[in-house]
A protein has these predicted regions:
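Alpha-helical multi-pass transmembrane bundles of energy-transducing inner-membrane proteins
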Residues: 28, 37-43, 136-143, 147-235, ...
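C-terminal ends of transmembrane helices
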Residues: 18-32, 108-126, 173-182, 251-265, ...
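Helix-coil boundary and interhelical linker segments in multi-pass alpha-helical membrane proteins
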Residues: 1-2, 149-155, 288-302, 342-362, ...
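Transmembrane helix-loop-helix hairpins at membrane boundaries of multipass inner-membrane proteins
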Residues: 1-6, 21-139, 214-230, 530-531, ...
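Predominantly late transmembrane helices and immediately cytosolic-facing juxtamembrane segments
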Residues: 254, 368-372, 438-470
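Juxtamembrane/interfacial segments at transmembrane-helix boundaries in multi-pass membrane proteins
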Residues: 63-87, 122-123, 128-129, 199-257, ...
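Central hydrophobic cores of alpha-helical transmembrane segments in multi-pass inner-membrane proteins
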Residues: 8-27, 48-63, 102-117, 144-146, ...
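Structural signature of hydrophobic alpha-helical transmembrane segments
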Residues: 3-13, 94-103, 157-170, 236-247, ...
Length: 545
């Protein structure tokens, strides 16, 4: 099935679901409240079914991915705008594949958790917005899934830009129309920041096309030909900045982060999961795929600056998180700190750092997603986002408290959980080149223990707050939503090899393109490489003991 259009079908399935949802009767259809509830339930079930079909199809695609095969697999290239060399070109390497898998796992989870979000059931007291269309909410969610799959799969820079910008539209409406509090302000701020970054990237994309026409060659936006352009060091530096600023805003990396706390706090929990769990990863993915691959000289030149910004972001996000009193805002600032750790691993320019950073993208998506969902479940019961309005929850809702604890411990990278593997690799990879940065990043991890444990202590332990005395524990739908994320955090923490094996060859290719070949990651498809990898792990364990 090597010629089967896996990626196209994966992206089209959610669009088909969106069309089916749009064809269902709306609120203006005749009938009473019971009929409206039945129609809303049908919409939710359609969205869930199509998201699960997308997940199953993506798993089948991953099974057919050949480790040790060509760098980009499941490729498909068709002319789109031939006059300007624009193609519909898609394909995935190991990095893109694991991020697509993370995306299609999170979407059905979010649908289950967001079952009543469109009606405002999870809003704090006094913050319920006007009742909005359930059809529109879940249609936007499925459209967003298509955009997210497309942005990771694109192998044409112009196509990537289209998906990169198109993602803003459904998320803008999900925040502005279905959010809480200052939702419109947060949505506009999110949109303006993103559009500013996108404008800079568009200028760089056009410049790339112009340089591709040098020597009378036909211009192209295809990724692979552009990666082999002979660009001067000066040109690479300027084009790097155009792409990097757009990705730093999307990630977000300090000091481009200020839109995130507002957007994540105003968004419904499900939308916040996709915002922090997936859309942020588009920024860090872009740094690996485009900044380093297309502009290696520019990447090397700006590496010290990016390392410095990453360390500042790690410490700043952690320190500000400690002072937060709003539950969702605290989790948002933890992401600012964690994204700094991811960019640190990327620009350490080592195999361990980039493998760890990519694995951290996946781990962070699951761990922070679980935190946001459970926080949303708490807010829907207590009708408050203030940490001080909780207390003693573990006595009345032990399952909720237990899962919240696991998600929180993942946030501080407890050994045995997937985030520990990620942070360990990032720190090891960084320490081999930037010892001071690695030490300062470790301080950020220590601070993470403070804000996570403080949050848990204030909300879950101590005397039972009278306002939460009747709080019900998680019910079946909520367990089905958050349970898979907790399971993945544990499973990938105990056995990360399948994911790391997918990532390793792609990281190797990226480092080769960046003219960094020492150390070279062992190739998982090579027996000698596997032995070397095992020997390295054993040696590291012995050294640590």
């Amino acid at each position: 099935m090597s010629n089967f259009p896996w990626l196209t079908v994966t992206g089209v399935i959610p669009l088909v679901g969106m069309i089916v949802i749009c064809l269902t009767p709306g609120r203006s259809a005749p009938g009473g409240s019971a009929d409206r509830r039945a129609r809303d339930l049908l919409v939710k079930r359609i969205a869930l079914v199509f998201s699960l079909i997308t997940l199953g199809f993506s798993i089948a695609m991953a099974v057919n991915f050949k480790i040790g095969g060509p760098r980009f697999q499941f490729t498909q290239t068709d002319q789109w705008i031939p006059q300007f060399g624009v193609h519909y070109a898609v394909g995935v390497d190991g990095i893109a594949l694991v991020l697509i898998l993370m995306t299609v796992i999170l979407v059905p989870v979010v649908i289950l958790a967001s079952w009543n979000d469109a009606e405002g059931a999870g809003n704090p007291a006094g913050a319920t917005p006007p009742r909005r269309s359930v059809k529109t909410y879940f249609a936007l969610l499925l459209v967003l899934e298509t955009m997210m799959v497309g942005v990771f799969a694109s192998l044409d820079v112009f196509l990537f830009y289209v998906f990169f910008e198109a993602m803003l539209i459904p998320m803008y409406f999900m925040i502005g129309s279905y959010g809480v509090g200052q939702r419109q302000y947060a949505a506009v701020k999110f949109l303006l920041y993103s559009l500013l970054g996108g404008l800079l990237m568009l200028v760089a994309v056009i410049a790339l096309y112009v340089y591709s026409t040098a020597g009378g060659r036909p211009g192209t936006f295809l990724f692979l030909p552009l990666a082999h352009l002979a660009l001067s060091s000066t040109v690479q530096k300027w084009l790097f900045l155009g792409f990097f600023i757009a990705f730093a805003i999307k990630a977000p990396l300090w000091p481009f982060h200020t839109w995130l706390p507002d957007a994540a706090t105003a968004a419904q929990p499900g939308a916040a999961v996709l915002l922090v769990g997936v859309l942020d990863k588009v920024g860090t993915f872009g740094m690996i795929r485009y900044c380093i691959d297309l502009f290696p000289a520019g990447s090397h030149y700006f590496t010290p600056l990016v390392i410095a910004l990453s360390v500042i972001g790690i410490l700043y996000g952690a320190i500000v998180a400690i002072g937060q009193r709003d539950l969702k805002r605290l989790v948002a600032y933890t992401s600012v700190s964690h994204m700094g750790l991811i960019t640190l691993g990327i620009f350490a320019m080592t195999s361990q750092g980039q493998v760890g950073a990519t694995f951290y993208m996946v781990s962070h998506g699951f761990a922070t997603g679980a935190l946001f969902l459970i926080a949303g479940f708490m807010i829907s019961r207590r009708k408050s986002q203030q940490i001080a309005d909780y207390g003693g929850v573990q006595k009345v809702a032990p399952v909720l408290a237990g899962l919240f604890l696991v998600a929180g411990l993942a946030g501080l990278a407890l050994p045995g959980l997937s985030t520990f593997v990620s942070e360990f690799l990032v720190l090891v990879g960084t320490f081999t080149r930037y010892e001071v940065a690695a030490v300062l990043a470790t301080v950020g991890i220590i601070l993470a223990a403070i804000y996570i444990l403080w949050m848990y202590q204030r909300t879950m332990t101590g005397p039972v707050n009278p306002e939460v005395a009747s709080m019900p524990d998680l019910h079946a739908r909520e367990l089905w939503a958050v349970g898979p994320l907790i399971a993945l955090i544990i499973v990938l923490g105990v056995y990360p090899k399948p994911v790391i094996d997918l990532i390793n060859p792609a990281v190797h290719q990226t480092l080769v393109q960046a003219h960094v070949t020492n150390p070279v990651p062992p190739h998982p498809a090579n027996a000698a490489g596997v032995k070397a990898s095992k020997a390295g792990v054993i040696a590291a364990v012995k050294k640590g003991s």
